[in-house]
């Protein structure tokens, strides 16, 4: 039996969105962007006035910015194990000296995504979006878009409301934990959230946000959670870069008019079913995938001892 964090109910004036389809319809009928619908929902859910709800989300944005800054300064940050760290700075220097194959905007997104998760791996402060293991995906997207689209703070906070509101639907119907659904549930969900939010700040419609979300999920469907030594470091840090890149590609395809053959809500349902179909070795146990390779097992033994 699946227990939802929240579900379709009516408590006086309060209604919790239960599907992407419902959000898109309300946006089209009301003329309001998804972000506005989610702000209204959050005010009703929390009982807080709008300015307090807004300020709380703004603090999330500030936390993200601080993590990106910390991970990109000096020589970077390093985890206690030494498995990860310093690679955001390497990308930063690469961007200065070379013409990247994927373009500077993409590399900026990758840098910020990796910087954030290197901070997480070094026991720093990040904003879980939707989890700490996938905390770099949204910062990777939003700060690149800030520079590329000249976003102001209001647009960036709205980006986070859109991402969070759609992420709630994913969480309620498929889950967001690697232990239950694999990395597709963490980085995959973050990528979908970011893709949809990117469409909105770029001037797209709610329907296009829905299409971007669906394509982002489909592109990462089946991604396993196989952290070496059970630590949120390898391959987790770099997978956030993939999540950011996938989100931007999915957003661009949606803005170009491309559509997902499978609707967003059905993609979320597939995400749930695939997650439950993954063996436990590929759901955050550190036993299968890359963690189960000879090198992965050797690293585990070195960190925790041969009998770990």
Residues covered by each model-derived region:
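Functionally critical mobile loop/hinge segments
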Residues: 200-308
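Generic N-terminal targeting/processing segments that precede catalytic cores or assembly contacts
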Residues: 2-124, 147-148, 257, 264-308
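Conserved phosphate/anionic-ligand binding catalytic regions in large, soluble enzymes, centered on
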Residues: 123-141, 185-190
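Glycine- and small hydrophobic-enriched segments that form the cores of compact globular domains
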Residues: 101, 128-135, 147, 152, ...
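Acidic-glycine-rich active-site phosphate/pyrophosphate-binding loop
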Residues: 103-120, 155-174, 219-227, 262
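Glycine- and acidic-residue-rich phosphate-binding/metal-coordinating active-site segment common to enzymes
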Residues: 160, 166-179, 183-193, 198, ...
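Alpha-helical support elements that line or immediately flank enzyme active sites
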Residues: 139-150, 195-203
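Active-site-adjacent structural elements in folded domains
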Residues: 123-126, 176-182, 234
């Amino acid at each position: 039996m699946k227990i939802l964090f929240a579900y379709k109910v009516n408590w006086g004036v309060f209604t919790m969105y239960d599907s992407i389809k419902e959000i898109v319809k309300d946006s089209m009928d009301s003329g309001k962007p998804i972000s506005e619908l989610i702000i209204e929902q959050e005010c009703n859910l929390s009982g807080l006035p709008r300015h307090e709800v807004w300020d709380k989300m703004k603090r999330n944005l500030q936390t993200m910015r601080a993590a990106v800054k910390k991970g990109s300064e000096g020589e970077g940050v390093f985890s206690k194990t030494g498995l990860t760290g310093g690679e955001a700075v390497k990308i930063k220097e690469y961007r200065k000296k070379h013409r990247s194959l994927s373009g500077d905007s993409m590399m900026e997104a990758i840098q910020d995504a990796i910087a954030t998760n290197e901070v997480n791996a070094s026991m720093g402060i990040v904003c879980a979006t939707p989890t700490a293991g996938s905390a770099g995906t949204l910062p990777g997207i939003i700060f690149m878009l800030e520079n590329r689209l000249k976003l102001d703070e209001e647009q960036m906070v709205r980006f986070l409301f859109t991402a969070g509101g759609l992420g709630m639907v994913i969480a309620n119907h498929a889950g967001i934990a690697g232990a239950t659904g694999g990395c597709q549930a963490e980085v995959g969900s973050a990528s979908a959230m970011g893709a949809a939010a990117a469409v909105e700040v770029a001037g797209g419609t709610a329907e296009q946000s829905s299409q971007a979300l669906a394509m982002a999920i489909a592109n990462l469907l089946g991604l396993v959670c196989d952290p070496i030594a059970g630590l949120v470091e390898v391959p987790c840090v770099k997978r956030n870069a993939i999540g950011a890149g996938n989100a931007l590609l999915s957003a661009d395809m949606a803005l170009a008019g491309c559509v997902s053959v499978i609707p967003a809500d059905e993609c979320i349902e597939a995400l749930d079913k695939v997650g439950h179909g993954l063996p436990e070795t590929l759901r955050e146990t550190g036993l299968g995938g890359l963690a189960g390779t000879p090198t992965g097992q050797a690293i585990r033994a070195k960190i925790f001892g041969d009998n770990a």
